[in-house]
Amino acid sequence: MRSLAVVVAVVATVAMAIGTARGSVSSIVSRAQFDRMLLHRNDGACQAKGFYTYDAFVAAAAAFPGFGTTGSADAQKREVAAFLAQTSHETTGGWATAPDGAFAWGYCFKQERGASSDYCTPSAQWPCAPGKRYYGRGPIQLSHNYNYGPAGRAIGVDLLANPDLVATDATVGFKTAIWFWMTAQPPKPSSHAVIAGQWSPSGADRAAGRVPGFGVITNIINGGIECGHGQDSRVADRIGFYKRYCDILGVGYGNNLDCYSQRPFA
């Protein structure tokens, strides 16, 4: 990944919603709001110009019951805001003095720039296909064969043989990102479980400062690099996207937005 190496060492099942799941993400975020959030994604300077569409997002979300449809209206809005914020950080083309602000430039990239590795780890379960490279692609910048394999199995596509689909088919790209979001990586909970209020931190979690909120989602995604050492500009960037998107959706941010004092998950 560009700023993140997602490492999923344990293949987990998709975390399905507990309780009431209803409707569609289209009832939570409209096309106009989506376009406002990702204001410059189709700018001529963006590598991903024309790739990430609202229709692809809605279609991908429909494949994961519970995503953006669990709990209260506010909980649903926060989940969509959190997902788009985290993935916006992974694909950002923004800078401090960018037009409309740094947080209007999410989804500018669809694949890792200047990848120097094939991200292939020898695996009997998820063997690399000859000549294929598993660098960061899509909204979450999915990396490594041991992520492409289980993600592909979950969505019914052979991504080990066809990793480029994550960056050439927007619905596939969104599906891999939502798969990652919905899937627990023990001892990490799923990001969905956290934002939907389904995760109860253990004593060890609390001792490590890991409590429910947007901050622990950053810890799940890239805690080993960004969390537990005080102020970090990457964490602040994620929070900036999240606050902007919550404001657009008209929902409060909740508590515990950063992971500055959280120890990373083991």
Swiss-Prot record:
Reactions performed catalytically: Random endo-hydrolysis of N-acetyl-beta-D-glucosaminide (1->4)-beta-linkages in chitin and chitodextrins
Keyword Signal: yes
Pfam families on file: Glyco_hydro_19
Known EC number: 3.2.1.14
A molecular function GO annotation: endochitinase activity
Any coiled-coil regions, as ranges: none
GO biological process: cell wall macromolecule catabolic process; chitin catabolic process; defense response to fungus; polysaccharide catabolic process
Swiss-Prot/TrEMBL keywords: Carbohydrate metabolism, Chitin degradation, Disulfide bond, Glycosidase, Hydrolase, Plant defense, Polysaccharide degradation, Signal
Leader peptide range in chain numbering: 1-23
CDD domains linked to this entry: chitinase_GH19 (cd00325)
Described purpose of this protein according to its UniProt entry: Defense against chitin-containing fungal pathogens.
Similarity comment: family membership: Belongs to the glycosyl hydrolase 19 family. Chitinase class II subfamily.
PANTHER family found in the cross-reference section: CHITINASE (PTHR22595:SF127), CHITINASE-RELATED (PTHR22595)
Protein name stated in the entry: 26 kDa endochitinase 2
